[in-house]
Amino acid sequence: MHEVGLFVDLNSFTQLILTLFFVSIGLLYFVKRTAAKYFEVGGGSGGFDRDHRRDFMVSDTAECSVCGKATTKKCSRCKSVRYCSAACQTSDWKSGHKLKCKGFRSTDSSPVRRDDIDFEASLFGNRSASKKTRIALVPQQSQSKATLKPTDVLFPYESFVRYYNWDRPIMAPCGLTNCGNSCFANVVLQCLSWTRPLVAYLLERGHKRECRRNDWCFLCEFENHLDRANYSRFPFSPMNIISRLPNIGGNLGYGRQEDAHELMRFAIDMMQSVCLDEFGGEKVVPPRAQETTLIQYIFGGLLQSQVQCTACSNVSDQYENMMDLTVEIHGDAVSLEECLDQFTAKEWLQGDNLYKCDRCDDYVKACKRLSIRCAPNILTIALKRFQGGRFGKLNKRISFPETFDLGPYMSGGGEGSDVYKLYAVIVHLDMLNASFFGHYICYVKDFRGNWYRIDDSEVEKVELEDVLSQRAYMLLYSRVQPRPSNLRSEESQDEKKTDTLNTESNQDGSVESSGVGTNDTSVSSLCNGIISHSEDPEYEKESSLSASVPVSEEGKEVDVKVDTVDSESNRSIDMEHDSGTDHQEEEANGKEDPTVENLAVDSSCLDITTPSPSAATEFIPQENERSDTESKPLEKEHSDTESNKPLEKEHLDSESKPLEKEHSDTEMIDAQ
């Protein structure tokens, strides 16, 4: 009799079991990776949630959390803490409860300002005890910000100075888990988390209530990130920000290796856009008011590009807003100071790279120099280590100091207070000088002055010597003292000082002609908060060494006002001078009348940004100038709106005899 059964191969059965086991593991891993894009994952998140919940667990007894008295009033945000009076509530919030219950605050669709919050206890003694009585924490809605005047300031500079000097100590740095090639984002978030004015603003005042964005907002998410990092004792995942990298920068993507410097620039630009959105956006806010945001106060500075023509001495100054400095490290430069010397070195525009001079209307040889017109409060310096090619990274060591003076690289010589202290360093680690892969770590200094080495989730306390010995990729410096506030009184004082110097120069018989004085005065407002722009969106201003001056009457002082002359007027003066048109001059009280001639400086490139009183005596007449006894001054035809121009005294030979006056002081001669 035969037995009926199912024959099973043991080897095949074992292979089937193993296959199903590995397939199930793969499916679980796939589900975890997919869920990580939408949910917070990481070993530290659970610990944070437990601590977070434990902080807000309260007993069922209705006792005040401060004095222990019986009460029925609750915190309107977390609904977990009870108070008996507004004094107890204020005391508890100052002790730290305000930051702890931020995550529970009610979302208000209308933007309000926290500066106007008035915490008052709602006392309803006649109401039933079953009804919940709470403390009113929602402020009155502020006035609308939609209507702006051209002179409006979006963020008071005095408030920024208060945040800049914020001295509230917070906990040590908290690590961030690597979510897959996210080290470049982790180091940027760590550096921003220790930028004092930004952290003080988000923790003390906050951005969520004022945010006007309907979609995802970087500042709102970064505020949540700071709240979590401030109270978390374990590393946590910054997935809420990393998963939104395409929203921060168009070419950034999650899971790819990216450049930390590129992300830093995108993040700063995004925060600037968010600040402008509170007032209607970049298209609504006037250009002058756009320079008065919190982000502009923190990272914004002004870069000056000065080009001087060697043929006509025309100087063109162009100003550009900067959020960071990117310097070359090629050549023999081995220190940060030498790199900045190369950055601000004079460059000759010649050969195939001639300069198109508007005054000469031709391509001529010129001298170009970059300098810092206005130093930012937070200076971010990126060293260009990545060159062309997959193995083109420059791994040479560039020394950098802890205390850094930016004064020698300022166009005006600095204000004497341009001293910075190092507070963050970003380092890129690689193999074989590869530029297409690597790992980012950072060193940050907390608000107590302690240095930490942060490698994703690993945080280690280090000494300053270890920081200064690194091959840095990015350096973040903060000013020892914040930049002085921009006051219009300072600008008026500068103008008054300029007029006083010109008047004294007239009394001494040596009147100077320079269009740079007004250029510097008008740009002085760019350095601190309110920026005065010209009609040109590129902030381009041109100054000239040629001008016209009205003839002064006998016994009266010559009123000299510094002004700039555009390229069109310069060309018209040149044409009149070439046509040989002559005018008459007179002698009054033993002094020659003011005259105007085209003067050319030496072929060497002079730094006209900071003119000295003796600089005017170094001018050399052009070749087409007539001899001392035959030369006749050229006088520009006055328009109805023409103002007084600075004059340049003509040096005549002692043997020359002045011509007699044939026309009155106010008579105009046709140059045609």
UniProtKB/Swiss-Prot annotation:
Residues 500-527, 606-615 have a biased composition (Polar residues). It holds the Pfam family UCH. The keyword Zinc-finger applies. It is an enzyme of class 3 (hydrolase). It comes from the Eukaryota. Residues 174-480 form the USP domain. The chain crosses the membrane at residues 11-31. It is a single-pass membrane protein. Residues 488-499, 533-543, 553-594, 623-666 have a biased composition (Basic and acidic residues). GO terms for molecular function: cysteine-type deubiquitinase activity; zinc ion binding. Zn(2+) 1 binds at C64, C67, C84, C88. Recognizes and hydrolyzes the peptide bond at the C-terminal Gly of ubiquitin. Involved in the processing of poly-ubiquitin precursors as well as that of ubiquitinated proteins. Belongs to the peptidase C19 family. This is Ubiquitin carboxyl-terminal hydrolase 19. It comes from Arabidopsis thaliana. The gene is UBP19.
